[in-house]
């Protein structure tokens, strides 16, 4: 399938990890925006084949992934730490464990202009930068050389990211010095939203509220953890907005799977064979799985997928509340373990509309922010698709 010497024909299957750009010895690979996401563009290729060797899509086989060894529902025992976490605080516990061993942690943060990127932390207080879910594809390109450098220096490295990002880092570091020091924690993912759309979203609300956004929350828990996916934003002028149609419009674009990367619809990293040593995500269905466990401030499902994962989990025993749960039970209530998001029939139409009309008009047309207009436009598009099928 991938018979060309470089990664230019991976196309829609590309997950945007940037490994190819990093590894190219002649800088022939550039990442360019297409449809709201970064894709590789290859020029003046010298046919060395290095990009193919470290591409997580080309090198993805179930044999290279781990079977789930143990499955749990869990949360961190410290209530205050749990309240500050999006889910059960498991990432904080793992990251703290690594920092205590003089290791380093890589995870997603909000950078300059609210751009989501990966960051290197080697101090316990820096772990707070990673708090909060960020439903935007994070840029990992700047940390790839740092990860390799840390491994070469004998550091214990924890990398946290989506399954495709974890697969990318493992592909890149495989065979490098001290590879056994790399520990990976994958965050369960149901498709990565566009950084371009999020940038437009931030610019729009800054314009409307005449102030710079200082923080953005995709999972505001002021009304409890179960009230999930409520957005909020804080501005430098002190304004705090919460759960309005403008903010929730962005959520609707994601929920409708318009604002999801093309490769996510055929995700190669889903299922019981996992990329990471540990897998963490929200545990939905907790009232049916374990109604006696207190999930008021969040609870996580945790999959332990390797001997490294088992070792770390055992070290956290005194810090966590947990219960062993059969994997099939978790799958029953957490579809992200089983299937990828479904591609909308008008997915390409959405991106053409966005490219032509911009974010605000797209939001009005494709989300509740548009009110009655939204409903009418959706109905018209549905009629058009029906007529096309009949013709």
Regions found by a protein language model. Give the residues of each.
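Short, intrinsically disordered, charge-biased short linear motifs at domain edges
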Residues: 1-4, 8-11, 40-43, 246-255
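Iron-sulfur cluster-binding cysteine motifs and their immediate structural context
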Residues: 9-13, 19-41, 50-67, 277-278
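Conserved nucleotide-cofactor-binding alpha/beta core module
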Residues: 134-158, 163-184
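Local cysteine-cluster metal-coordination motifs and their immediate loop/turn environment
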Residues: 12-26, 46-58, 162-168, 260-272
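Gly/Ser/Thr-rich loops at beta-strand to alpha-helix junctions
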Residues: 87-89, 112, 159-169, 191-193
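Long, compositionally biased charged/polar accessory segments in the mid-to-C-terminal portions
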Residues: 101-104, 206, 211-391
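Flanking helices and flexible, charged tails adjoining ferredoxin-like Fe-S electron-transfer domains
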Residues: 1-4, 47-153, 328-365
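Short, flexible loop segments at boundaries between secondary-structure elements
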Residues: 180-204
